[in-house]
Amino acid sequence: MLFNTLALISLLIVLMLLNTLVGICPSLLACLIRWKESVNLDASVKLGRDRDIMALCMLIPFCLTVFRFRLYDPSWTDGMLPNPRLAAIIGIFAAYVALRSVLEYGFRSKKMNPKTYKTACKASYTFFSVLTLLLLLTGGVLSFIGVNPEDIKNAMLWISALIYMLFIIRKFQIFVSSCSFFSGFLYLCALELIPTGAVIASAVIF
């Protein structure tokens, strides 16, 4: 099964990079508390690189978690066999990442400090990694103690919503450190509401 193969690959990658992943965790958690920690993280070449590696390592586990607990469960996936459904989820996530990248490139402005803009955009790497770790921990613990799968799903969705809200706040704070309140709001709408809204719409409407 595709799920088992990808899970094994993910496990091997995590084991190979375990020291790097453990070492970056304190910096990632600090970014949840203060927006300036994201600036400090990006100012360090090593920490920035390790954060990027962490985000890459979390890509497959995130998709597997979404698949396993049906966090993204639009009606058009009903009746699909496991492998095609997992492939569809990976495809949707890849499209989401691609759309974010295009928007981040297209909305770059000379009026904003390039380093600040880069830090704001890369904050998604930090919060994505933290979210994935929390989802894995939640799924593992609640499954082990026998919690109903639907309750696990709801808990994960609440965690996802809270982390995303915190991410929005921190990203906005980074933006307004280099531009006006209104400009920061417009950047946030363009870079976050469009791609995230598209994913939500694909799950609710279709």
Q: Could you say what each language-model-derived stretch is?
A:
Residues D52-F69, A94-A95, L99, S129-T138, ...:
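Hydrophobic alpha-helical transmembrane segments of multi-pass integral membrane proteins
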Residues N4, R49-I53, D78, P82, ...:
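Hydrophobic, aromatic-rich alpha-helical transmembrane segments
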Residues L136-F206:
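Terminal transmembrane helical module of multi-pass membrane proteins
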Residues P26-L29, R70-D78, G106-K115, V176-C179, ...:
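Membrane-interfacial segments
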Residues M1-I53, C63:
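N-terminal juxtamembrane cytosolic/stromal segments of multi-pass membrane proteins
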Residues S75-F144:
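Alpha-helical transmembrane segments with an aromatic anchor "belt"
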Residues M1-M16, P82-Y96, E150-S160:
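Alpha-helical transmembrane segments
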Residues S38-I90:
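Hydrophobic alpha-helical segments and helix pairs
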